[in-house]
Structure formats: C-alpha cells, structure tokens
Swiss-Prot record:
Residues excised as propeptide: 21-60
Gene Ontology cellular component terms for the protein in this record: extracellular region
Source organism, top-level taxon: Eukaryota
Name used for this protein in its record: M-zodatoxin-Lt8g
Length: 129
C-alpha cells in the first residue's frame, strides 16, 4: 500500500511537470529582438538568458515522454485493479466486471480504485485504534 501511495505521488509530480507551460523558443526570441530593436546591454543579457531556456524545452520533452509512459502503465494497472475489486466486491464474473470497467472513463476508474483503497486504509487505521 505504501508503494502504491508513493507511485501516485510520483505520477502527480510528473503530471505537474508535463502540464507546465513550454519555454519560449529561439525563433520567438529573434522576433522579440527584431520588434523591440534592442540595443541596451540589459536587454541583451535578458535575451541571452531566455536563449538558455531552449535546454529546458529538451528536458521538459524528456519528462513529458516519461510522464506519458508512466501514466499509460498506471492506467493499465488501475484498470486491472478495478476489475479485481469489482469481482471481489460485487461477486460478478470477470467478464462482466471487465465490461463494466470498459464502460467507465479513465477518471472514473482512478476514482473507483482510489476510493476502494482509501476505505481499506481507513478501516485498517481504525482497527489499530
């Protein structure tokens, strides 16, 4: 259960990284330079700093691809867990549970699984008290 919570925290962190705004490209910086006709030294330093952001775009692309892979695997695991939970909880066949889960959206599947494990963790905590 601890590993599951840690994995969800990592997925949330990667989601934040993937959702962040992309840095300005070098082409856009050239347009800004032409529009403003920058001659001031401070402006040149500012543009130089923004040019370094292209490296950040490459890093963001790497983390974005990694995030997509992790999210895809997490979705598959959640789908399998949802089927197992339904079979166990509702006492229906695996095929019927699979059909129900297939009809659900990814968000509904995540909520269903997290709700189940949340109740389970709460029960364990109350038993210890």
């Amino acid at each position: 259960m601890k590993y599951f919570v840690v994995a969800l925290a990592l997925v949330a962190a990667f989601a934040c990284i993937a959702e962040s705004k992309p840095a300005e490209s070098e082409h856009e910086l050239a347009e800004v330079e032409e529009e403003n006709e920058l001659a001031d030294l401070e402006d040149a330093v500012w543009l130089e700093h923004l040019a370094d952001l292209s490296d950040l775009e490459e890093a963001r692309g790497f983390f974005g691809n990694t995030w997509k892979k992790i999210k895809g695997k997490a979705d598959k695991i959640m789908l399998k867990k949802a089927v197992k939970i339904m079979v166990k909880k509702e006492g229906i066949s695996k095929e019927e549970a699979q059909a129900k889960v297939d009809a659900m959206s990814k968000k509904q599947i995540r909520l269903y699984v997290l709700k189940h494990y949340g109740k389970k963790a709460l029960q364990k905590a109350s038993e210890k008290l």
